Amino acid sequence: MARREKLLEKMRRTPAKIRFAEVHALLSYEGFVLFNKRGSHRSYHHADGRLMTIVVPHGRHKTCHPTDVRKVLEAMRR
């Protein structure tokens, strides 16, 4: 669980510098399953019914939008 804790702490400190792979890893640790890949959006579903859609950065952007990172952090609090 050390990697999960480090990812959460990094997201809290600097939400503007989080890559999509890190968001995907944290959602996987929390039990979210990728169920829809359409274009630049990835949708995740949790067994308890929670849904989450994350926009994959493209072009020159390397990191996820801070709003998406905050949305993931809010889902972790529940």
Range-by-range predicted roles:
Residues 1-29:
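A charge-rich, low-complexity, intrinsically flexible signal that marks solvent-exposed coils, linkers
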